[in-house]
């Protein structure tokens, strides 16, 4: 959504994202490719965490571990992606498995267990980057968790309604000045901001904004935000600097949807689960 305040922003361009398309070293191994931890997937929403985790794996993380927000994980493994390692969130947080970046909040729910999971993560994550999405943002807005997350990079990924909750504004006010809302969030939380929507805004912690021009209405379906959060966490886990990883993830997510539509998959009926394979193809292209 372009407004007078966003139409003049510089656009995110593929040629400005060399780290996304660099060749992988011949001596790479799963440890050198980064480990992503995903915290989410409360009752009835396990799919959200799995969408994020699958996307993280398919855009290049060496390992992806999932901590479900449940006392007992409802699944022993992901039958569609058995490479993912599933456990309950406490088991993951206490395992000390050398997580390089975290994606948290996808489908975690709004109950006390979810708030405890995120609070424990904020305390234990050390120097690992953090992507906070979905219910994680709603818990933050409600005061159920506190923004005590240290100096390592943090990325918040609100849609306009979530941004409004975080700022105490209406969705309409956020949409009327999307760059202003993104800058206000960056200043309030000392974080990178991805304000999602048509023409997503990426804002760094200092308030510099860019607009994304990739993507299409096929993304207007459940789970696409979880996929974006997984891509973001994965690129950060691969030790790509936030200056490349954050705009790069947003560009890649939209470009993956565009590539699917070009091949007749959508926009009507495009599903979130189809994005990760498309994003993988793009990362491996050199065009």
Curated annotation (Swiss-Prot):
Transport is among the record's keywords: no
Boundaries of every YjeF C-terminal domain copy: 13-286
A Pfam entry, by short name: Carb_kinase
Keywords: ATP-binding, Lyase, NAD, NADP, Nucleotide-binding
Binding site for AMP: 196-200, 225
Catalyzed reaction equations: (6S)-NADHX + ADP = AMP + phosphate + NADH + H(+); (6S)-NADPHX + ADP = AMP + phosphate + NADPH + H(+)
Biological-process GO terms, alphabetical: metabolite repair; nicotinamide nucleotide metabolic process
Residues the record lists as binding (6S)-NADPHX: 48, 109, 159, 226
InterPro entries (alphabetical): Carbohydrate_kinase_pred_CS, CARKD, Ribokinase-like
EC number: 4.2.1.136
Cofactor(s) listed: Mg(2+)
Name of the top EC class for this enzyme: lyase
UniProt GO molecular function: ADP-dependent NAD(P)H-hydrate dehydratase activity; ATP binding; NAD(P)HX epimerase activity
PANTHER family per UniProt: ATP-DEPENDENT (S)-NAD(P)H-HYDRATE DEHYDRATASE, ATP-DEPENDENT (S)-NAD(P)H-HYDRATE DEHYDRATASE FAMILY MEMBER
Family that this chain belongs to: Belongs to the NnrD/CARKD family.
Subunit organization: Homotetramer.
Described function: Catalyzes the dehydration of the S-form of NAD(P)HX at the expense of ADP, which is converted to AMP. Together with NAD(P)HX epimerase, which catalyzes the epimerization of the S- and R-forms, the enzyme allows the repair of both epimers of NAD(P)HX, a damaged form of NAD(P)H that is a result of enzymatic or heat-dependent hydration.
Protein name: ADP-dependent (S)-NAD(P)H-hydrate dehydratase
Source species: Bordetella pertussis (strain Tohama I / ATCC BAA-589 / NCTC 13251)
């Amino acid at each position: 959504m372009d407004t007078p305040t966003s139409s003049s922003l510089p656009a995110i361009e593929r040629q400005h994202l060399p780290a996304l398309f660099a060749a992988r070293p011949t001596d790479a191994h799963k440890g050198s490719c980064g480990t992503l931890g995903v915290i989410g997937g409360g009752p009835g929403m396990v799919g959200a965490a799995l969408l994020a985790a699958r996307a993280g794996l398919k855009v290049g993380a060496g390992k992806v571990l999932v901590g479900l927000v449940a006392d007992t994980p409802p699944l022993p493994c992901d039958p569609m992606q058995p490479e993912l390692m599933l456990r309950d969130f406490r088991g993951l947080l206490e395992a000390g498995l050398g997580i390089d970046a975290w994606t948290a909040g996808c489908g975690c729910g709004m109950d006390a267990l979810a708030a405890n999971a995120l609070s424990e993560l904020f305390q234990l994550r050390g120097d690992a980057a953090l992507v906070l999405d979905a219910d994680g943002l709603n818990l933050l807005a409600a005061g159920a968790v506190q923004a005590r997350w240290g100096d390592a990079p943090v990325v918040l990924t609100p849609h306009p309604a979530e941004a409004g909750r975080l700022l105490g504004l209406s969705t309409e006010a956020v949409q009327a000045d999307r760059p202003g809302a993104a800058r206000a969030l960056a200043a309030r939380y000392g974080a990178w901001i991805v304000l999602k929507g048509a023409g997503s805004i990426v804002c760094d912690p200092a308030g510099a904004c860019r607009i994304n021009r990739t993507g299409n209405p096929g993304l207007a379906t459940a789970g696409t935000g979880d996929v974006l959060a997984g891509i973001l966490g994965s690129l950060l886990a691969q030790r790509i600097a936030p200056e490349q990883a954050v705009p790069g993830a947003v560009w890649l997510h939209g470009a993956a949807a565009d590539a699917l539509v070009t091949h007749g998959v959508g926009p009507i009926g495009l599903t979130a689960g189809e994005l990760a394979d498309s994003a993988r193809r793009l990362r491996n292209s050199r065009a």
